[in-house]
Amino acid sequence: MIGRISFVIFTLVFLVGYQAAKSQSNGSINGFELVDKAGNIRKPSDFRNRYEALGTYAVLDPKGNQMHFTYASPGTAEYYREHGTFADGTVLVKEVFGMDHAQMTTSDAHWASGAKVWFVLVKDQKQRFGNNPLWGDGWGWALFKADAPDKQVATDYKKDCVGCHIPAKSTDWIYVRGYPVLTSR
């Protein structure tokens, strides 16, 4: 009897340890660690090192060309490929830079120069913050500008954020076609 109890305890300890190690090894991040009790979102300070690169956009605009780099919390692409949706707690960070260019031997080359803004989204399948105007349509929405990179400045996702995402409504408000890692290995 003691042998069986010891075996059960050993098995439980092993499984708990295995799950913890698995979580640690895939670097899964709970996006709600970035959210306070009122639903205020902070920008993750280490997203360039810990998050996956989803994709890059070049936006050529007469008002100012931009480079958009989008990162996702670890495990996002794998989960999306398996389920066709973003997991609850997924974090997306879009870092927007200005763009510079020069004539090089190969052509007119362009590159990112000077961060302008960061957009941070946290997937919320449970509608946790229904009274917060920065939460809705399945996401928490936040905007941070270069002049105060730790200060969230959006006031209402319907006024400040979702307008740019309307063409992507059918894909959970995200332009997934720009992120091939979500659909291919």
For each of these PLM feature ranges, what is it?
Residues 42-44, 71-72:
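Short acidic/polar alpha-helix capping motifs at helix-coil junctions
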Residues 24-37, 43, 47-56, 60, ...:
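Sequence context surrounding c-type heme c attachment/ligation sites in exported
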Residues 67-77:
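Short, structured beta-strand/loop micro-motifs enriched in basic residues and often containing a Trp
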Residues 16-26:
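Bacterial Sec-dependent signal peptides at the C-terminal "C-region" and cleavage site
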Residues 6-16:
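Bacterial N-terminal signal peptides
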Residues 80:
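Ligand-binding pocket segment of bilobal, Venus flytrap-like solute-binding proteins
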Residues 1-5:
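Positively charged n-region of N-terminal signal peptides that target proteins for export
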